[in-house]
A protein has these predicted regions:
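Short loop/turn motifs that connect adjacent beta-strands in outer-membrane beta-barrel proteins
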Residues: 20-23, 36-44, 89, 131-140, ...
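Residues that define the transmembrane beta-barrel architecture of outer-membrane proteins
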Residues: 43, 72-78, 115-123, 139, ...
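Residue-level signature of outer-membrane beta-barrel architecture
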Residues: 51-53, 84, 96, 127-129, ...
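Surface-exposed strand-loop-strand hairpins of Gram-negative outer-membrane beta-barrel proteins
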Residues: 52-77
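Outer membrane beta-barrel transmembrane domains
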Residues: 58-60, 66, 217-340
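Outer-membrane pore/translocation modules
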Residues: 111-206, 213, 266, 270, ...
Length: 340
């Protein structure tokens, strides 16, 4: 039942695609909770939806606790996706998400900076390079190349001052609360899977690299890289447990020539970028082709450049359903028989 781990990976891409991790211009680590995914059967479709909650009031200077810069950062996010097996080796996915809120609460809860709206549209084709079963052990290797296109706003503003003489004065909100980073990004992905059928144990790993582009404000968020190592096992037929150790790296934000990130957008470049390690348990309930799951991300190690809000609480839950769009065909010498 490999598909119990196939869907959290996409919400990981969608939310972490805008993560930068700086005190004035990042999203902490909302991507956390990645899971591996290979390909579907030919003519098989998968639909899934997930809800994700993120909260953090932890702040770090490098790897040390430090004083809070604001009260907390939190978000509520829903993510939906469709996959289709074009051939037995090639699967195409499309996904998008919506933030009900991304909020930065100031100290003493005196003020709130927040936004909501659509995040990114993700196109994610994957190709199975190797897939064989021998002695009840199945081995699979998959590569993917994806594209992330922003749908929501990356330049929402906040009212700073209102005066009868000069009117309203607005400032662009920090990237921590923007629904998207506003750039077109490329994604490079690999997946290795080994299934020990008799023991109902699965070992697998994935690697992801996101190459950022520049947005319309002249900002280029740091590239993102991660690698995950997984162990999964099915219990009592319908219950599955998967554990993951994930390491991630986020590069520093950059700007086009002539753009002053501090003066224009209050972003301190020295406080962007991070290295983190997470432990991610996941539990799933399987009913035929329908799966319900819940997962959480537990930070084990965090090192941030400068001073930033860190990762603290991230919980994801959702469902996944697979079905055949067309009945499989049995080929004979003279004609094809469609199985109903």
């Amino acid at each position: 039942m490999r598909h119990i781990t196939s869907f959290v990976f996409f919400i990981f891409i969608a939310t972490n695609s805008s993560a930068q991790g700086c005190c004035s211009g990042g999203a902490g680590s909302p991507i956390a909770g990645g899971a591996a995914t290979g390909v579907l059967q030919k003519n098989q479709m998968q639909v899934s939806a997930n809800y994700q909650y993120i909260f953090s009031n932890k702040f770090y200077t490098e790897n040390r606790d430090t004083n809070a810069l604001f009260d907390n950062l939190n978000s509520n996010y829903i993510f939906y996706r469709m996959d289709y097996g074009v051939t037995k080796k090639f699967t195409f996915s499309i996904a998008a998400g919506y933030f009900f809120n991304k909020s930065l609460i100031e100290l003493n809860q005196t003020d709130t900076i927040h936004s909501k709206g659509m995040g990114d549209l993700i196109f994610f084709p994957r190709y199975d390079l190797y897939n064989k079963t021998k002695n009840n052990i199945r081995t699979e290797f998959t590569l993917g190349l994806g594209l992330k296109i922003p749908l929501g706003s990356h330049n929402d503003s906040t009212l700073m001052l209102s005066h009868p003489s000069i009117g309203d004065i607005y400032a662009i909100s920090p990237p921590t609360v923007q629904p998207t980073n506003g750039s077109n990004d490329l994604m490079f992905y690999s997946f290795f899977f080994r299934d020990y059928t008799i023991n109902k144990i699965r070992l697998f790993s994935n690697a992801l690299y996101i190459k950022r582009g520049y947005n319309s404000l002249g900002e280029k968020f740091g590239d993102y890289a991660s690698i995950g190592l997984f162990v999964g096992k099915t219990f009592i037929r319908k219950w599955g447990v998967t554990t993951q150790i994930k390491g991630e790296w986020i590069g520093e934000i950059k700007a086009k020539e002539g753009i002053d990130l501090v003066a224009d957008y209050n972003i301190d470049i020295a406080s962007t970028g991070s290295k983190k390690i997470f432990f991610i348990p996941q539990i799933s309930y399987i009913k035929k082709s329908f799966v319900v799951f819940a997962t959480c991300e537990i930070p084990l190690y965090q090192y941030v450049n400068g001073t930033q809000v860190g990762s603290q609480i991230q919980i994801t839950s959702g469902f996944n359903y697979r079905f055949m769009v067309k009945s499989p065909e049995i080929k004979t010498d003279d004609y094809d028989i469609q199985v109903n």
